């Protein structure tokens, strides 16, 4: 059984003079939505990609790095615990240790998963936090994602909303306008970058489906 990783003395930035950025992911949606962003960030910044291990099955994780032509993460935290409390605690603890030992200039997260709670440690260490998909609300406080997104929105230094509607939610929370930007969704770039592979896919044959004759539910 894997144990959470707390020692990151083997993880180093390249120290190439570029901004040192840690991107934290942990689930399939984050990997997909951030694919184009990760590629662009690696072009302009000194990047460490850290995976919390929230989704650790190959079909929910590894296959997407392969299909989206992304390099494997530099860090696997293996933060999944025996229950929700242990997992959330491990994510915060592992991330805090990673930030202390690598000293990034910024931390980027997307969305509202438990992996986004990694930024709590960044806030305590006064590391700037960049939050994509900020301002989303479902108004159901029983959902754990609603709690996560409210926490991350409030403590982030830069909130990147997908829409003007989401930006207004951030304003209603009291966040100043200089901390919020409407950037749109990065999924358009992900689809554009992978359009040839999507059109050439044999998934219909493999799943015995006929185009236009099925409904996809997720």
Q: For the regions a protein language model found, what residue spans apply to each?
A:
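A nucleotide-sugar donor-handling region in carbohydrate enzymes
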Residues: 2-9, 54-59, 78, 155-218
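Active-site and donor-binding regions of nucleotide-sugar-utilizing enzymes
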Residues: 22-25, 30-37, 64, 76-176
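Phosphate-coordination loops involved in phosphoryl transfer and adenosine-cofactor binding
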Residues: 18, 104, 211-212
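Structural beta-sheet core signal
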Residues: 23, 49-51, 109, 131, ...
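Gly-rich Lys/Arg/Thr-decorated short loops/hinges at beta-loop-alpha junctions or inter-strand turns
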Residues: 17, 72-75, 218
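N-terminal subdomain of nucleotide-sugar transferases
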Residues: 2-54
